[in-house]
Amino acid sequence: MKKILMMLFTLFMSLQSVQAMNVDAFIDKNIAPYTDAIARMIFFPIKIMGAEVPVIILWILVAGIFFTVYLKGIAFWGLKHAVDNLVKKPEGNDDCGDVSSFQALATALSGTIGIGSIAGVAISISIGGPGAAFWIFAGAILGMSIKFMEASLAVKYRRFNLDGSVSGGPMHYIAHGLTRRKMRWLGQPLSVLFAILCIGGGITGGNMIQINQTAHQIIFITGGENSIFHGYAWVLGTIAAILIALVVMGGIKGIAKVTTILTPSMCALYIISGLIVILANFSSIPSALALIVKEAFHPTAVAGGIFGTIIIGLRRSVQSNEAGTGAAAIVYAAAQTKEHISQGFVALLETFLTGILCLFTSFAIVFSGVLENTHIGEISGIELASNAFQSVISFFPIILSVIAVLFAMSTLISWSYYGQKAWTFLLGEGKKRVITFNIIYCLFIIIGSAMNVKSIIDITDAMMIAMCIPNVIVLYVLAPEIKRDLADYLKRHNMNFIKF
């Protein structure tokens, strides 16, 4: 802890000696070219009916459709059982794990319901039009079956360390699941690839975009170009880095205690605020809903037409709910349960709730009418959402700022754990290795706060979505055993309305 705080303090003092505007510009100028190059490589496109469609998006779309059909629409009939599993009392002391199922869900939600649920959705709608909102939610529905697979496999293939703590997630079910099928030659390299991508995804999507958009919102509500923080975004990043360092050193149990309180509170606050904006524009609801559906299938001002809108919506959906990335499976592996299928059902709620929150952002923006005369690049996503809230009540941007900070901090906390587990999977368990990762993670909070939003968005989507490549490959391979386990689970729990 002292090492992390001392390093951050030293960096803070050294940056004070440089003109603030130059610090932000220097960071963006020297980091952005590398992030742009990575994004272009991962989002390699092919042309379909005149639209450039990234191959990786098609990869995830096909997986969502396949697993939804393969598991017979579990996203629809499994929700009630998911709630039942979440509220039931623990089965006894035999349940192994670090955190309860609810704590695991809260931590996973805090990782997915980040600033992307506000800023990312706003940016996607400004680019893809109102129709993007439809495809963002559709992507969440398709992603639920994928999340079920990930959480179930994470618990099934988790490992218990010598100190009694749990390690699990895609790294482990890729390595051990394929080894069990005599495919170690494939499992080892894919697990290593996933761990590397998870670290990258944690540093970008779980870190840099969160602090970047939060810093922009704080600067926006404190005067914009006249704000005392204008040009000093790195100062806000340094403060956040210190706060995160204080939390993450408590490990998963400490993280779970924070997220269990933070996640329900911030979700409730955002939903109430969103409802006020929506109800204030009640007369516009029918026409706005009709516009969303119409633009989803017949967009009027989007490059690539319907395919352009679908790709923009699905791309944001994946970044928001993380289905296919396997990230949340890392914390689900730590859940106190003997039934891996049971935790899979609980995971359905995470993706569904994330989709609902994204809908609230979409509705607030579309219903308020702030999309008119909005041009991407001239305004950040969080500012667009802020304008929607401000259109109803003048001080709402302040409330949104509080929500944005809560969303960002919770995501920063959860992804520090995901990245840490990927780091120790590669380098081995050990206190020094954990501290090293935490230092690196906190330094990138400062870097992310000062970068241009366009560079952040591109590398965030690229690194997060790239995690789907090794993860989804193994989901296909291990799907038959999860289907058998699910059939057995349903039989034992007298859920005979679905036959496998």
Q: Residue ranges of each PLM-predicted region?
A:
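Flexible loop linkers connecting adjacent transmembrane helices
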Residues: 73-101, 123, 129-133, 145-186, ...
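Alpha-helical membrane segments and immediately flanking helix-loop junctions
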Residues: 94-127, 153-156, 162-177, 193-199, ...
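Transmembrane helix-loop junctions in multi-pass membrane proteins
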Residues: 70-75, 117-121, 203-215, 225, ...
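Membrane-interface loop-to-helix entry segments
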Residues: 3, 59-62, 67-83, 208-218, ...
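N-terminal alpha-helical transmembrane segments of multi-pass membrane transport
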Residues: 2-115, 125-132, 143, 476-500
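Membrane-embedded translocation segments of transport machinery
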Residues: 249-260, 265-333, 338, 387
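Extracellular/periplasmic helix-exit of transmembrane alpha-helices
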Residues: 150-162, 273-291, 302-304, 333-335, ...
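Helix-loop-helix module between adjacent transmembrane segments
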Residues: 67-68, 110, 139-166, 175-212, ...
